[in-house]
A protein has these predicted regions:
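Short strand-edge motifs at loop-to-beta-strand transitions and within beta-strands
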Residues: 95-97
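Flexible glycine-rich surface loops and low-complexity tracts that mediate binding to linear polymers
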Residues: 99-101
Length: 115
């Protein structure tokens, strides 16, 4: 797991762990890494899938995931934005989210919230 407790761009290595925690008392924006950097970290090809859990149960404010370069919210996330496209994670006992990252090439991926 990697801890990100202040607004930042997540590194490809942090996202590749599959588990990010945040315990910040302030609202925190975490930007997904570029498709190029994350693709290189994972040695991704079209069809590579990574599940990422963001754990904000120890935080006191929301975490907002921000789409980075060469990443887009998936079609499911766009058409059903309130669930599959929700990039905000509450704090406290309900503060868990799971995102599925699906690569369309070695340098580009889509993001879907799956839990």
């Amino acid at each position: 797991a990697s801890a990100i407790n202040a607004t930042a761009v997540a590194t490809a290595a942090e996202v590749a762990t599959g588990y990010i925690t945040s315990t910040s008392a302030a609202g925190t924006n975490i930007t997904f890494p570029t498709g190029t950097l994350l693709g290189a970290e994972l040695q991704a090809t079209a069809g590579t899938v990574l599940d990422l859990v963001v754990d904000n149960t120890g935080g006191a404010s929301v975490v907002t995931m921000v789409v980075g370069t060469n990443a887009i919210v998936s079609d499911a996330g766009t058409t059903t934005a309130a669930s599959f496209g929700d990039l905000t994670i509450a704090s406290g006992v309900t503060g868990m989210a799971k995102f599925t990252l699906l690569f369309s090439s070695a340098t580009a991926y889509t993001i879907t919230r799956t839990a």
